[in-house]
A protein has these predicted regions:
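Small-residue-rich segments of transmembrane alpha-helices in multi-pass membrane proteins
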Residues: 16-21, 77, 140-157, 212-214, ...
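Membrane-interface helix termini and inter-helical loops of multi-pass transporters
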Residues: 29-34, 159-169, 241-244
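C-terminal ends of transmembrane helices
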Residues: 65, 122-135, 196, 264-273
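Extended hydrophobic alpha-helices typical of membrane-associated regions
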Residues: 236-304
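Multi-pass membrane catalytic core of lipid/isoprenoid biosynthesis enzymes
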Residues: 45-46, 64-117, 207-246
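Structural signal for membrane-spanning alpha-helices in multi-pass inner-membrane proteins
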Residues: 19-27, 97-105, 124-128, 149-157, ...
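Membrane-embedded alpha-helical segments that form the functional core of polytopic membrane enzymes
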Residues: 16-62, 97-101, 111-125, 168-194
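Intramembrane alpha-helical segments
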Residues: 2-5, 74-164
Length: 304
């Protein structure tokens, strides 16, 4: 169980779920042309999980001192798992992930795509060792990588199968994935800032310069409120523009996504304690989960 917690298995489950839903809840129902066999798709999921798990491990290695302040009960490195073991696991998972990436890239006739796995692995290392100490940049990098976990499915499964004959449908489905990717990026970016609000004490002692440390909790909370409010308006606009005639999907978005985000907006305005921020971080995680779970519902939408 210690090793599962080290790689943050809940987050890995979420990544696997979203990739599976994109293929089997969106691509297959729309009968778009796809490139990967079921086996190779499973390898894509495994490669993504390996890179993500390695990123979680290296982040924990660099964050040991900070985590002893922010969440001492969850520290694993140096207590239940040695740093050497964690480093070996980090290297092994990266080798497996990148190796599978090379195989898949060549199997679809896009050998250059292998570089993506190397770049993602490098970004996760740089994030843990350096980028997370730069205001907002670390938050953006993590959020970008979350969004890319969705886009990777389209790059490897959808893009290579595009032809002149199927271009219109393939592009329409690709657009849906891009919308969800932007949703994941924006929501995760907000959540990363909320986590910075939650971890301000440990980050300050660890020398990490986050937005709450730079401008204070109150101002940061106001910025988060504005970002969340903009996201609410953006989702409502999307519903009006594209889902107006689809009542089931519109109601799902309204109650599962817009409603919780409005609750978040109300609570973040007056949030002051670590418990408040921890709760709000969980709210955003639930919203992201519910948002991703709406992917299969799009099979009932006529894409334009």
């Amino acid at each position: 169980m210690n090793y599962l917690n080290l790689v943050r298995y809940q987050n890995l489950f979420f990544i696997a779920l979203v990739q599976i839903l994109i293929r089997y809840g969106l691509f297959i129902p729309f009968e778009v042309d796809i490139t990967l066999s079921d086996f190779n798709f499973a390898l894509l999921v495994i490669a993504t999980l390996c890179i993500a798990a390695a990123g979680n491990i290296i982040n924990d290695i660099y964050d040991v001192e900070i985590d002893r302040i922010n969440k001492p009960q969850k520290v694993l490195i140096g207590k239940k798992i040695s740093e050497q073991t964690a480093n070996n696991l980090f290297i092994a998972l990266n080798v497996i992930g990148v190796g599978i990436g090379f195989y898949l890239s060549n199997s679809i006739g896009k050998p250059g795509f292998a570089a993506l796995f190397i770049v993602f692995s490098a970004l996760l290392y740089l994030y843990s060792s350096y980028l997370k100490g730069i205001i907002l940049l670390g938050n953006l990098v993590v959020s970008f990588l979350v969004a890319m976990s969705l886009i990777m499915v389209t790059l490897f499964d959808l893009l290579p199968a595009i032809t002149i004959e199927n271009k219109e449908l393939q592009s329409a489905v690709f657009k849906v994935v891009l919308y969800f990717s932007f949703f994941a990026l924006a929501l995760n970016f907000i959540r990363e800032i909320v986590k910075d609000l939650q971890d301000i004490n440990g980050d300050k002692k660890g020398g990490i310069n986050t937005l709450p440390i730079a401008i204070g909790r109150k101002r940061t909370s106001r910025i988060v409120f504005v970002l969340a409010a903009l996201m609410v308006f953006g989702i409502i606009y999307y519903m009006y523009e594209y889902l107006y005639n689809y009542q089931v999907l519109s109601l799902y978005f309204l109650f599962a996504i817009v409603g919780p985000l409005l609750f978040f907006c109300v609570k973040i305005w007056d949030a002051k304690t670590v418990k408040h921020y921890a709760l709000l971080s969980k709210v955003l995680k639930v919203v992201m989960f519910l948002g991703i779970c709406s992917i299969p519902l799009f099979q009932y939408v006529v894409l334009e």
